């Protein structure tokens, strides 16, 4: 996947940073924007990439899933970035995926995800359930982990928790755990009263 002629001829290489700086997800995504900017500063201090400085282009999709797609299109079509570092939730990634595939852009996705998706336009840098959730459950089922026999699968009500819990439920079934020993509960984004859920 090469850069367009306009990007190659420029004095700088534009790098898109697309993380929510406002809304529900800002608490998780703002630090990723900060780390990306710090890394760009460090790279530029060492001479840049191929002798060119990196130029960050920061957008705020504001924890609004459809706005992620609009901002992705803006970064690729108008701002002409060479690459984008962005998203956090799976729903935001799924929102931008058609845009990156249509415009042949490149997205670096920074966190774990539910798997069951591949695209030549995305670097999935986080763990999938078989690398993270299943080993954790295997440990909990082991003697060292407490030999757990019952499982409470709690998550925010969106793609990642639901898909991961579907995978975990199938894994638990394969280990002989019955449905009566698996409970799933989903909460909306921004939910904070977990005491009531845990007490049940």
Where are these regions (language model features)?
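Short, low-complexity disordered leader/linker segments with a strong preference
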Residues: 1-14, 45
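Glycine/serine-rich loop-strand microenvironments at binding/catalytic pocket rims
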Residues: 9-27, 100-101, 106-110, 114-124, ...
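Signal peptide-proximal N-terminal region
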Residues: 10, 33-56, 146, 173-180
């Amino acid at each position: 996947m090469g850069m367009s002629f306009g990007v190659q001829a420029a004095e700088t290489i534009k790098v898109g940073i697309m993380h929510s700086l406002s809304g529900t997800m800002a608490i998780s995504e703002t630090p990723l924007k900060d780390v990306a900017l710090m890394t760009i500063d460090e790279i530029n201090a060492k001479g840049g990439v191929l002798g060119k400085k990196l130029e960050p282009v920061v957008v705020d999709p504001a924890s609004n899933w459809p706005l992620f797609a609009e901002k992705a299109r803006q970064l690729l079509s108008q701002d002409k970035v060479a690459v984008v570092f962005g998203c956090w939730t799976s729903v935001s990634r799924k929102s931008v995926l058609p845009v990156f595939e249509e415009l042949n852009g490149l997205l670096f996705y920074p966190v774990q995800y539910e798997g069951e998706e591949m695209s030549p336009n995305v670097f999935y840098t986080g763990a999938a359930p078989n690398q993270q959730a299943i080993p954790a459950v295997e440990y909990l089922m082991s003697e060292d982990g407490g030999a757990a026999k019952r499982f409470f699968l709690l998550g925010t009500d969106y793609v990642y928790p639901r898909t991961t819990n579907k995978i975990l439920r199938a894994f638990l079934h394969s280990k002989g755990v019955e449905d009566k020993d698996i409970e799933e509960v989903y909460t909306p984004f921004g939910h904070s009263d977990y005491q009531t859920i845990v007490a049940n």
